[in-house]
UniProtKB/Swiss-Prot annotation:
Name of this protein: Chaperonin CPN60-1, mitochondrial
Record keywords: ATP-binding, Chaperone, Mitochondrion, Nucleotide-binding, Stress response, Transit peptide
Role summary: Implicated in mitochondrial protein import and macromolecular assembly. May facilitate the correct folding of imported proteins. May also prevent misfolding and promote the refolding and proper assembly of unfolded polypeptides generated under stress conditions in the mitochondrial matrix.
Native organism: Cucurbita maxima
Record GO cellular component, one term: mitochondrion
An example Gene Ontology molecular-function term: ATP binding
UniProt cross-references to NCBIfam families, sorted A to Z: GroEL (TIGR02348), PRK00013.1 (NF000592), PRK12849.1 (NF009487), PRK12850.1 (NF009488), PRK12851.1 (NF009489)
FT transit peptide: 1-32
Pfam families, sorted: Cpn60_TCP1
Keyword Nucleotide-binding among UniProt keywords: yes
Length: 575
């Protein structure tokens, strides 16, 4: 009887606890973010304010006499830069709708930077010019879709005109001129990039790193460079420079760790039989196997060295396969039923010389079949085109460079960290612009190619008046790069634009650095076609979208003073 009563009491308590929890849940607040909705002219006006403020901050960097921008950082010293995309990325507004406009301009700058690597400032000021005129036209009753159609027709016409006037470049001097312009007139940077391209070719990888001196330097690594050094310093053959140097070596490439002494002995016998040095590339060499290699090197005088395979996962596999193709060997992998104890001479690669330091390995003049190497390069190029990941593209580009030529490193020097950082931004822009110029050719610089293309739009036929206004919006926008460059140099921009449009020489422009009118191509003031084409197309695309916007939905900021509702009583606490 007592047990029965205790059971009932227990069930009653459980029921009461359940009721308390249900009551508690009914008191919970659902804190969904409230939205603010802006319509029509108000929405576009606020977006335009964000676009204008961001563009005004970016445009001061344009041209040879553009100014720098100082950006506060959450950690470390403030960043000093003259790079448009860096300035754009750093700007965030408190007003949410204003921020939407700014974010869309950042999108333009990033898209232009991703495709062409330069021209972000040009893209930003073009976006502001097109969107400003578009907003005025829509507010005065124009049809937004017809305006958009007119803008699109005008851009297509300008791009066709620019392509017809582009000139391909090939000489080192022309490459240096493009680099100099993008580096804000610093001739040394332009020449450094031209030398790097001459050394590693147009497809070669050119990287930028911090230098250790006050001067800018170029270091070129020919052949394949692996970012792995010797496993043990006992492999060193040249005590003076602390490197292991192997001439005409055999190269064994193994995918896994080497732990078996028998496997090591088999490989050493092959090298001894041929009286040639040996390089072992594997995931790792474990202690007993490593000791065997070192003893044979020290006591038997066999020139041998072991390095770890660079990279991780699929990248490591692909890198080893590249090395095998370059040296004419095979990757020994258990997946194909191969092992080290059954290795024969045909599986080993070779090259003219290998130099191994504690940090890296350089393989010169691999013995691989030229046709096989070219096929491998084509395969990697296809992978680059198909890839959507920036990281994957970068890794594939590195692999291609290692196979096809070499790697050039631009070491940027300076008196302080801030100076080096600012110079690196300019060198990156210059390098990207140079690659774009080699790819699609050049046009007269200083904004004049766009300015003169605006003349051609007078003849463009349109279906109605609103489309004609869309064409005129682009015509006016194309004048802004020259206007901005002149204004930043302390000259009245409208006067410069007017004077250039009065005459008919398509190469005449305003040299803002010297303050005179010159033949831009002869003066070496040139722009890559790819850069200005991408800037215009991206700017027009996003501006058109913003012009046709009728509603903007943003989250309302949370009220920091709002106190959340208290939960109900906790179940199971009655005694």
């Amino acid at each position: 009887m007592h047990r029965f009563a205790t059971g009932l009491a227990s069930k009653a308590r459980l029921a009461r606890n359940g009721a308390n929890q249900i009551a508690s849940r009914s008191n919970w607040r659902r804190n969904y973010a409230a939205k603010d909705v802006k319509f029509g002219v108000e929405a576009r006006g606020l977006m335009l304010k964000g676009v204008e403020d961001l563009a005004d901050a970016v445009k001061v960097t344009m041209g040879p006499k553009g100014r720098t921008v100082v950006i506060e950082q959450s950690f470390g010293a403030p960043k000093v830069t003259k790079d448009g995309v860096t300035v754009a990325k750093s700007i965030e507004f408190k007003d949410k709708v204003k921020n939407v406009g700014a974010s869309l301009v950042k999108q333009v700058a990033n898209a232009t930077n991703d495709v062409a690597g330069d021209g972000t400032t040009c893209a930003t000021i073009l976006t502001k010019a097109i969107f400003t005129e578009g907003c005025k036209s829509v507010a005065s009753g124009m049809n937004a879709m017809d305006l958009r159609r007119g803008i699109s027709m005008a851009v297509d016409s300008v791009v066709t005109n620019l392509k017809s006037r582009a000139r391909m470049i090939s000489t080192s001097e022309e490459i240096a001129q493009v680099g100099t312009i993008s580096a804000n007139g610093e001739r040394e940077i332009g020449e450094l990039i031209a030398k790097a391209m001459e050394k590693v070719g147009k497809e070669g990888v050119i990287t930028i790193s911090d230098g250790k001196t006050m001067d800018n330097e170029l270091e070129v690594v020919e052949g394949m460079k692996l970012d792995r050094g010797y496993i043990s310093p006992y492999f060193i053959t040249n005590q003076k420079n602390q490197k292991c140097e192997l001439d005409d070596p055999l190269i064994i490439i193994y995918e896994k760790k080497i732990s078996s002494i028998n496997a090591v002995v088999k490989v050493l016998e092959l090298a001894l039989k041929k009286q040639r040095p040996l390089l072992i590339v594997s995931e790792d060499v474990e202690s007993e196997a490593l000791a065997t290699l070192i003893l044979n090197k020290l006591r038997a005088g066999i020139k041998v060295c072991a390095i770890k395979a660079p990279g991780f996962g699929e990248n490591r596999k692909a890198g080893l396969q590249d090395l095998a193709v370059l040296t004419g060997g095979q990757v020994i992998t258990e997946e194909l039923g191969m092992n080290l104890e059954k290795v024969d001479l045909d599986m080993l690669g070779s090259c003219k010389k290998i130099t191994i330091s504690k940090d890296d390995t350089v393989i010169l003049d691999g013995a691989g079949d030229k046709k096989a190497i070219e096929e491998r390069c084509d395969q990697i190029r296809s992978g680059i085109e198909a890839s959507t990941s920036d990281y994957d593209k970068e890794k594939l580009q590195e692999r291609l460079a290692k196979l096809s030529g070499g790697v050039a490193v631009l070491k940027i020097g300076g008196a302080s960290e801030a100076e080096v950082g600012e110079k690196k931004d300019r060198v990156t822009d210059a390098l990207n612009a140079t690659k774009a110029a080699v790819e699609e050719g050049i046009v007269p610089g200083g904004g004049v190619a766009l300015l003169y293309a605006s003349k051609e739009l007078d003849k463009l036929p349109t279906a109605n008046f609103d489309q004609k206004i869309g064409v005129q919006i682009i015509q006016n926008a194309l004048k802004t790069p020259v206007h901005t460059i002149a204004s930043n140099a302390g000259v009245e921009g409208a006067v410069v634009v007017g004077k250039l449009l009065e005459q008919d020489d398509p190469d005449l422009g305003y040299d803002a650095a010297k303050g005179e009118y010159v033949d831009m191509v002869k003066a070496g003031i040139i722009d890559p076609l790819k850069v200005i084409r991408t800037a215009l197309v991206d700017a027009a695309s996003v501006s058109s979208l913003m012009t046709t916007t009728e509603v903007v939905v943003v989250e309302l900021p949370k009220d920091e003073n709002e106190v959340p509702a208290m939960g109900g009583g906790m179940g199971g606490m009655d005694y």
